[in-house]
Amino acid sequence: MLAWALLSMSASAFAANATLDQVMALLAQRKHGEVKYVEEDYLKMLDQPVKSSGVLVYDAPDHLEKRALKPKAESLILDGERLTVERGRRTYRMDLGEDPQVAPFVDSIRDTLAGNEQALERVFKVTFTGTLEEWQLKLVPLDEKVARKVSEVQIAGARDEIQSVKILETDGDRSVMTLEPP
């Protein structure tokens, strides 16, 4: 009886991994994507969320742009390990390695878009739930410094599309980004 229970647990763990593998394989096939986004940042110090909207553009394997259109124009452009922020007439540049707390969150989105399961598992404890048609990744930071700031990142989607990204901070603040085709 115990052997049967262990065998069935192994089979369900295999099925979950197979589905995660399938989702990652589908995501990896996409070489370009462009979606509209609406982001709401819920901060303890504010009564209402801070809202922004714009366009996300992804080009495999490591180019990601977040172009905010409202309330103010702003661009965050990630090429490889180089992050460029454009606000008005000012441009800021940094390497992701300069701020080890920023890199995991950028990489959580970029590595998911790239279908890079191994890269995600180097930085996060990855938990997959759902089916190919409706799935969710729960990413818990492995690095203690990062985990003191962010408790988890939740990414939800269907097949090869990411539909939402939630970042839950340990202090109760959270960011919710909803994605939809343009």
What are these language model-derived features?
Residues R89, R93-Q136:
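Flexible, surface-exposed loop/linker segments and immediately adjacent secondary-structure boundaries
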Residues L2-A3, A13:
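Cleavable N-terminal signal peptides
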Residues V55-D107, S175:
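An acidic-aromatic
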